[in-house]
A protein has these predicted regions:
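Conserved N-terminal segment of class I S-adenosyl-L-methionine
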Residues: 6-161, 289-292
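A conserved beta-strand element that flanks and buttresses the S-adenosyl-L-methionine
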Residues: 167
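Short catalytic micro-motifs in class I SAM-dependent methyltransferases
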Residues: 170-174
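A short, conserved alpha-helix within the catalytic core of class I
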Residues: 175-193
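Conserved beta-strand signature within the Rossmann-like core of class I S-adenosyl-L-methionine
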Residues: 196-209
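Short alpha-helix
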Residues: 227-243
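Core SAM-dependent methyltransferase catalytic element
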Residues: 251-273
Length: 292
């Protein structure tokens, strides 16, 4: 991904904030779902098969196929990813956005959906090096490395760039206090962190404590902090959303325990990244903010 003048991405250069972020929220400890895998938090090993014509088959935590014409087939949770696809299409078509950061990108399905709907500057970030490698292999097979790129990343450290849209899917229950440590500041600090890298919209998937995955693995309880489970609530999350952003929409992605919050970036309480110097901000391709 280039950061030449005119690109939708610009490098993040605020050294003071970088220093504070590194001290405050670096990955606290390695906590893996399956100890047999040396990286990541998922049990599934990523597998990618690339045909001679460029068609791609990905299996693992995410399961999808990309055909030679660019069409994507969702092999699991098609209803969920179809909803996300519709939201991305609206962000691109109605608002003109073309840059997106996919936080917790895994094998790149969300990024591929964004690319398919018209985003042309997409960066994936994940702490699992095997899935990051899979993402980049898929991008290369689709001849899309100028538009799609992923790199290894620890949540809470500075992102390498900023974008008009930041998407953070299905990792809140991990980063709240387990694979990262935002326990002291809670959802307020998580949103403040993410908002530094989104110039227009922030999309976050809420994972409710009633979710089967959370009830089975007990992510928050595993943090070992007294009373922490009482802080990981939808009421606290929505309070932080209302404090730091304008909520444009929310919709269930996969039952009532997984809900996507679509937020517009504000200038509240000096928390907006627009407080930085104009030269450090990505250009606003279209700043229309009608009803989402």
């Amino acid at each position: 991904m280039s950061s030449v003048p005119g690109d939708s991405f610009e490098p993040y250069r605020n050294k003071t904030r970088i220093s504070k972020l590194r001290r405050a929220h670096v990955q606290r400890k390695d906590t893996y779902k399956d100890p047999s895998r040396p990286v990541g938090t998922q049990s599934e090993v990523p597998i990618v098969n690339i045909a001679s014509d460029g068609a791609v088959r990905v299996r693992g935590y995410q399961n999808y196929d990309i055909y030679t014409d660019g069409q994507i087939t969702f092999r699991t949770k098609a209803h969920k990813f179809s909803k996300i696809e519709a939201i991305f299409a609206k962000l691109h078509t109605h608002h003109g956005f073309t840059s997106l950061i996919d936080v917790g990108c895994n094998a790149g399905l969300i990024s591929m959906i964004a690319w398919r709907t018209g985003f042309r500057h997409v960066m994936g970030l994940d702490h699992d090096s095997e899935y990051v490698e899979t993402f980049n292999r898929v991008a290369a097979a689709r001849n899309a490395t100028d538009s799609l790129h992923a790199q290894v990343f620890s949540f809470g450290t500075p992102m390498p760039t900023r974008a008009e849209v930041v998407f953070c899917g299905a990792i809140l229950h991990w980063v709240f206090c387990l694979t990262a440590d935002f326990s002291s500041g809670g959802f307020d600090s998580i949103l403040r962190y993410l908002l530094q890298f989104a110039s227009e919209y922030l999309l976050v998937e809420w994972i409710d404590p009633s979710d089967d995955a959370m009830m089975g693995f007990q992510h928050i309880k595993k943090c070992g902090i007294d009373g922490i489970e009482n802080r990981y609530t939808v009421a606290n999350f929505e309070r932080a959303v209302a404090t730091h952003t304008t909520l444009m929409s929310k919709q269930s992605l996969d039952g009532p325990s997984r809900v996507l919050y679509v937020m517009r970036v504000d200038c509240r309480a000096g928390l907006s990244p627009t407080a930085e110097s104009p030269s450090s901000r990505p250009p606003a391709l279209n700043r229309r903010h009608g009803p989402f």
